[in-house]
Amino acid sequence: KMGMMYQCFCTRSEIKAEIMRAGNAPHEEDYSVYPGTCRRLSVEERKTKIDQNLSYAWRLNIRAASKKLGNLIWNDIRLGQYTVPVGIIGDVVLARKDIPTSYHLSATLDDHIQKIGLVTRGEDLVTATHIHKILQMLLGLKSPTYLHHPLIMDTKGVRLSKRTRAQTVKSLKASGLKREDVIDLLGKKNILSLLSLIN
């Protein structure tokens, strides 16, 4: 009804090739910014692709959202105010042919249904929060309060994560480290920063 979504038939390799062709080589954090190829398809072109049974994803038309919303302004308890031009976000995937909702849409609706009042996540997910705030505004949903905490780094400054098979706090304690040692390793500055917000 709102004209905020469209079908995208591009594969990941086609998207990457289009970004490279346009001379906008993606940085690691920018890789998800879609160049809008299928946004420009005519109704007939879209119908032809559907008739060919091509797989597609549903994308948010961020240009249409930008016209409706303008700038996104929101506050994080720790990081302060963000003012983001909606148009820079990119046409994010909201659903796929085989998966009815994306992480972004699911998280936004789940927070609303469960009446979540505070969302706490790593500061590496601020961009995801921009997307969730946009979806909340478009869907007329009440927004929770957000707190983006500092990331925990190892001694080399690399973020601890499952993806890099970093040691867990449980495994550090099992190796004989005391609570104080683990806190030192995680960074007192980060821990104290979070504790000051809680108190």
Regions found by a protein language model. Give the residues of each.
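Proline- and acidic/polar-enriched loop/turn elements at helix boundaries
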Residues: 11-12, 148, 184, 198
